[in-house]
């Protein structure tokens, strides 16, 4: 084989299912949601667009806007010479404040529109691939021109608010072009889900290949897996957690099975009763023939003897049998007058005690052994028939072409889970204990294996693995409780860097700095505006036009 399957395999699919919370989802895993949150990426987009937009204007444009604004204000308000300094300052302050508010509103609306566009490259899927396999399949496609045109129409509605300002118009046109270019790039990249794509590794070319809808697409390697001897071992965080997650899940599953087995409606061990067997034999003999049969009478004698456990009982049974049979015999001594002859009952006693009793006892024992074997075979075949009937009934209930519905014993209803367990080798049925056998072990105890400690350990392990693997920084309150986590600069280099430059192709886009990771768009705008080219121009114009008035002088006048 020249290629090795990387995904989908049992190992890789299992890692994605762990991320989705299918196995032993604990509190520590919620930390992963902070990693895959796309807010940090969009803050980076906002930062670059905002900074570049403010740098697009020129000093001449800003100066002309100020002169135009100041002239219109003076035409409406004619201050005295004493009030001229304060008038200049208030006019200048209202001008640059309204300009900043307009810029913030337009750029924030543009970024909000981009964030809410559903057809852009998914940052969440990118993080899922990095956390599981370490490789990311990427599909290059045509930009969604319809989305871009709708975005431009959305921004054109704001043009009326900036049409009177030359500098704001310049910023607005730059924003439309820059944001449209970003949106085109975001819609030209697609990261498929793990159910839609297959990834292989070419051993000869030493490169990864992916297939999506029968098309070959590119693969970006973030954390290279270890490949050798036809096997793939992922070096991802979830791979390191997988064994502990599955161990905790299996323990929880075991506990659930114990709970289900211990909540059965009725549980009993049935032992066959000898009296019941003997009665069945007698009824069978009665049905076979109603005539007096010597074998039948002797068999009845042996059965009654077996039922009696005391000496007196045995004596009474024998006496009754001899009396009953003796009444049917002809007494020749009375008939022919032979005084010395023995009574027939005496001869009968001797015959019963000697030959006939021994022979019939052996025969009856053989018959009982045969009956016992037949009962075992009957129980075995009844069990098989019940299983076949259950399978047939399920097949009849399911529509054709559909497979069996998988059930989860942790989440299914109790009755459904019990029914599923009955078909999985854990039969909740009663079995007869045959003669010669005894119970050497029982499972009547209400034992449920503990799993809380495993869950707590797994919770801490998730936290440590996520924090250390992605270099996250915790935000703690005054009581020492962690409120949330944020990206550090190392996290940005490790996750945002490849996504921005390698996958999306924003080569000129600067990475976000750590201080902006948890700030709102308006807070970021405050910092960016204070260090922008536009702010420098405005400060220079303000210093040349007016100085901040002395409030004490103004109050004295």
Curated annotation (Swiss-Prot):
Q: Please report which protein family the annotation says this sequence is part of.
A: Belongs to the herpesviridae portal protein family.
**Function recorded in the entry:** Forms a portal in the viral capsid through which viral DNA is translocated during DNA packaging. Assembles as a dodecamer at a single fivefold axe of the T=16 icosahedric capsid. Binds to the molecular motor that translocates the viral DNA, termed terminase.
Q: Tell me, what is an example of a GO biological process annotation in this record?
A: chromosome organization
Q: How does it assemble?
A: Homododecamerizes. Interacts with terminase subunits TRM1 and TRM3.
Instruction: Give the UniProt entry's GO cellular component terms.
Output: host cell nucleus; virion component
Gene designation per UniProt: 43
Sorted alphabetically, the keyword list is: Coiled coil, Host nucleus, Viral genome packaging, Viral release from host cell, Virion
Q: What is this protein called?
A: Portal protein
KW Coiled coil (keyword) present: yes
Question: Which compartments does it reside in?
Answer: Virion; Host nucleus
Matching Pfam families: Herpes_UL6
């Amino acid at each position: 084989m020249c290629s090795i399957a990387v995904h989908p395999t049992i190992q890789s699919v299992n890692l994605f299912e762990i991320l989705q919370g299918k196995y032993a989802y604990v509190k520590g895993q919620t930390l992963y949601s902070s990693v895959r949150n796309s807010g940090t990426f969009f803050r980076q987009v906002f930062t670059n667009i905002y900074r570049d937009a403010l740098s697009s204007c020129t000093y001449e444009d800003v100066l002309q806007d100020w002169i135009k604004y100041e002239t219109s204000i003076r035409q409406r308000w004619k201050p005295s010479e004493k009030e001229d300094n304060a008038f200049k300052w208030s006019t200048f302050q209202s001008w640059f404040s309204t300009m900043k508010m307009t810029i913030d509103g337009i750029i924030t609306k543009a970024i909000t529109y981009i964030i809410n566009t559903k057809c852009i490259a998914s940052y969440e899927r990118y993080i899922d691939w990095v956390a599981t396999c370490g490789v990311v399949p990427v599909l290059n496609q045509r930009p969604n021109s319809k989305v871009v045109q709708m975005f431009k129409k959305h921004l054109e509605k704001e043009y009326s608010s900036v049409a009177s300002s030359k500098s704001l118009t310049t910023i607005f046109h730059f924003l439309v072009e820059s944001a449209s270019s970003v949106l085109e790039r975001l819609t030209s990249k697609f990261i498929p889900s793990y159910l839609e794509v297959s990834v292989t590794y070419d051993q000869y070319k030493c490169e990864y290949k992916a297939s999506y809808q029968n098309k070959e697409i590119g693969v970006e390697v973030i954390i290279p897996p270890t490949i050798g001897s036809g096997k793939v071992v992922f070096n991802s965080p979830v791979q390191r957690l997988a064994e502990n997650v599955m161990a905790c899940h299996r323990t929880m599953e075991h506990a659930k099975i114990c709970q289900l087995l211990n909540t059965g409606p009725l549980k009993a061990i049935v032992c066959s009763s000898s009296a019941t067997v003997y009665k069945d034999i007698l009824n069978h003999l009665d049905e076979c023939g109603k005539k007096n049969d010597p074998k039948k009478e002797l068999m009845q004698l042996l059965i009654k003897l077996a039922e009696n456990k005391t000496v007196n009982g045995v004596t009474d049974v024998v006496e009754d049998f001899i009396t009953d049979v003796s009444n049917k015999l002809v007494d020749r001594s009375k008939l022919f007058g032979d005084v010395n002859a023995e009574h027939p009952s005496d001869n009968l006693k001797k015959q019963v005690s000697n030959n006939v009793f021994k022979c019939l006892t052996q025969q009856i024992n053989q018959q009982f052994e045969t009956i016992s074997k037949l009962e075992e075979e009957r129980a075995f075949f009844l069990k098989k028939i019940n299983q076949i009937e259950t399978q047939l009934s399920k097949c009849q209930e399911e529509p054709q072409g559909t497979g069996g519905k998988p059930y989860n014993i942790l989440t299914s209803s109790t009755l459904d889970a019990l029914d599923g367990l009955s078909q999985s080798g854990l039969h909740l049925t009663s079995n007869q204990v045959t003669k010669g056998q005894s119970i050497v072990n029982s499972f009547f105890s209400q034992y449920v294996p503990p799993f809380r400690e495993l869950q707590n350990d797994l919770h801490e392990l998730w936290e440590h693995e996520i924090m250390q693997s992605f270099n996250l920084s915790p935000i703690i309150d005054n009581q020492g409780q962690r409120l949330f986590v944020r990206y550090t600069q190392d996290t940005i280099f490790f996750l945002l860097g490849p996504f921005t430059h390698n996958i999306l192709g924003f080569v000129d886009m600067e990475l976000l700095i750590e201080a902006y990771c948890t700030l709102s768009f308006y807070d970021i705008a405050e910092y960016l505006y204070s260090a922008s080219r536009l702010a420098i121009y405005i400060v220079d114009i303000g210093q040349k036009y007016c100085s901040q008035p002395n409030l004490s002088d103004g109050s004295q006048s």
